[in-house]
Every structure is written in C-alpha cells, then in structure tokens.
Amino acid sequence: MEFNKTEPELLTDLVFKAMRAGEGEMERLKQISKKSYELFGSLESRDIFYQIISDGEVLEKLKKIPLGAVDGSFQSVGGLGGRWYVMIGIAQVIAERGFTLNPVINVDGIIEPLNAVDEGVIYELSEVLMMLGEMLAIRKVANRLGGGEESYILIDGPIIDPPLYANEKYVEDRVNTLRFCYTQNIHVIGFVKRVRGSHFLNYLRRKQIIEGKNEYFINDLDLLSSVMFNAIKNRASPVYTYPLNYEEGCTNEDKTALTYKMYKDRGLNIYYTYYKPSARGRIFRIEYALFENLSEQEIKERFNRIMSLLNQVWTPLGMDQPLPIIIAHNKCNVRRGAAETIYYEIMTRALSEGNLHLWLESLTESYI
C-alpha cells in the first residue's frame, strides 16, 4: 500500500491534522443537511419537482413507440514520430417496434491516423472525430425509425457535444443532423450521466430562491444530490425537476452559453431537466432538442411523456439507466488495453522489413 510507503513522521502529522479536519467537516455536513432540507421545502412550494405519472393505457402506447440509441468511444495511442492512431467505436441500438429485450445492434470500428504535437491536441481531435461518427450513426438510426407518427433517439451525452467546440462547420452539420430527425418525427434526447457546472444553481439565483453566493452549495451536483434525495423520500417515487431552457441557467461568464448561441441562431432550442430515479441512484440530466416554440404547459407535457418512456418503459427494475443507453455504451467501448494491442499490431507490420526497428528504438528512448 502507498500509505505504508509514506514516511512515518509525515504520516503521524497528517493523521492528527485529519482528525481535526474531520471534526470540522462533520459540522459542515450537518449544516448542509439542514440547509438542503430548508431549500427543499422552498422548492417544493414552487412546484420545482415532478413525479413521473402515466396510466396503464399511456404506458402500453409508449411501449410500442420505435426507439434507438447511439453512443461512441475512443482511445488514442502511439505518438512516436508525431503520429497517433485513434481507435473509435460507434454503436447503434434499434428497436423498430418498441420495447424489446433483444434490439438490433450495429457496431462500427474506425482506425484513424492523426498527426499532432501532444496528447492534449490529439484528445480534442479524437473527440471531434468520434462525434462525427456519432452524427452519421444518428442519421442511420433515423432512416430506420423515421416516417411514423412518433419515435425517439437517445444520445449517450449532451445535445451540444463537445460543449465548448464552436467550429462553424461542425455546428452546422450537427444542427442539420438534429433537424433531419425532427423532419422525420423523431425526438432526440440527450442522456447526460455526468452533471457538471452550476446551471440549476444559476437559475435559482436568478429567481432569487437562493441569494448570491452560497457557501454550502458550490455546483449543481452538490445542490441536487441532497435536495432531490429529500424529494424522493417525500414522494416515494422517481422525481425530475421543472424543465428549463438552456439559456435560463447560463451566465455571461459561461463559455457554454456562447456555443449554445451558435446552435440557437440556427433554430435549435434545448430544454433540460435533472432526474433522480431512486434514493440511492445517481442524478442525470435529460436534454431535449426542439425546432419549434412550445408553451410552458406543452413543454411540461412533453417531458412527462419523455420521462415516462425512459423510466417506466425502458429502465429495468434495479437499474437507473435506460436499457438502450446501457447496451450502446457497452457495445461501443474501446478499452485501453485493446487499443494498445491493435496499435502493437499496426507497428509490428510497419516495422517488419529493413532496419526501421532501429530507428524506432532510438526514438522510443527519448520518450522514456
């Protein structure tokens, strides 16, 4: 253990200081628990939390709605001589006749060589390549599901992805892909697993529900984890928050607001809610892409339908994510060890003739 390798004098000093820090943290957590319950009461009185409500007849109809899911992953390996290889996996999950435990699954693998100065640059390039692959997959799924009265495509991630990538051509292509789905009567839903930032906190400040900076709640995850836990205990059912327009949680300092403006200028509106399926479950952000203006009541009705589809139709008992999202994530996952083995195969073939391996060995020493 790393703990045992640390110098004993240093460990002794740190342990005593940790005991004092723990006492202070205990008091802070007590205050957070108290403040979160007070805030829950304030939010509850303003109808911020909603239960997922659908009768049997509605659920039977939802089960028959076609649905697909798309996800992608990547690994970048190499770097010798400035050449990297990006391994990309893209998965499509398609249920053309509605709910099923055996949907159609299509998986595409891509190997793309890229030249870059360092890992930071290659990561950004790789992420964009993966997203372009996902856009192509969304169109393929839309071609299978579109043309009917109503269908859905779930994206494992946000609608605007990458959130800070403001390339005009890329934004145009992504908006066109989402608009194509819209013309085919397909609702595109972003299922975001990592809640980041302080958009909901900003909204509460704007509505003066929370005043100014708050020492107890720093970001949305801290705030919602405690408050939505109380909401679930109170209602004994999954809950989600009042749907917000993307702009309602942005500030002038928020870089994502600048990216969203590029999408909105092209006609795209995004609404989102925070969703907690169980007391011990994680918090997710559910995003909805729109190319029309709806009233507040219409937005609420749309989200109740979306949440019913996700939670009551496609989320199995004991799980907190919809089945298509789970399948797509697992099927597209390019694991690090697999990417390194494939890269080894590429280099083995590349260096099979002549004295190229001598050059490689000399170059490798400079990376050690």
Pin down the residues of each PLM region:
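Conserved P-loop NTPase mechanochemical-coupling segment
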Residues: 116-123
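Short loop/turn segments at secondary-structure transitions that flank enzyme active sites
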Residues: 73-76, 93-96, 159-161, 194-197
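Two-metal-ion RNase H-like nuclease active-site motif
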Residues: 65-75
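Acidic, metal-ligating active-site segments
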Residues: 75-116
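Long, contiguous domain-sized segments
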Residues: 1-60, 65, 123-152, 157-368
